[in-house]
Amino acid sequence: MAKKSLIEREKKRQRLVRKYRVMREYLKKKEKQVFSLEEKSKIKSKLQSLPRNSAPTRLHRRCVLTGRSRGIYRDFGLCRHIIREKAHACLLPGITKSS
């Protein structure tokens, strides 16, 4: 089980990404459309003034149940350990052992 502080930090990042997504997309589109160097630098400074954690590249996938950050399957949102346990208990429909 991951530390609660790490899980909460990740949730905070997700909230920030959702909050600033529209603004970030707008500034990036505008930067591509503008040709003058001065305006580009102004837009770039506005983009850099946004919170660092509002960038989607700073997000990490975490297991929904345990908070583990590695070995996450996108389809389920679970780590490999939990998927194995749930599959053996027949709690994941459509999952069978390969051998």
Curated annotation (Swiss-Prot):
Q: Name one GO biological process term.
A: translation
Which PROSITE patterns does the UniProt record give?
RIBOSOMAL_S14
Q: Does the keyword Chloroplast apply?
A: yes
Q: Where in the cell is it found?
A: Plastid, Chloroplast
Q: Name one GO cellular component term.
A: small ribosomal subunit
NCBIfam families per record: PRK08881.1 (NF006477)
Sum up the protein's function in the record's words.
Answer: Binds 16S rRNA, required for the assembly of 30S particles.
Protein name (database record)? Small ribosomal subunit protein uS14c
Origin organism is Welwitschia mirabilis (Tree tumbo)
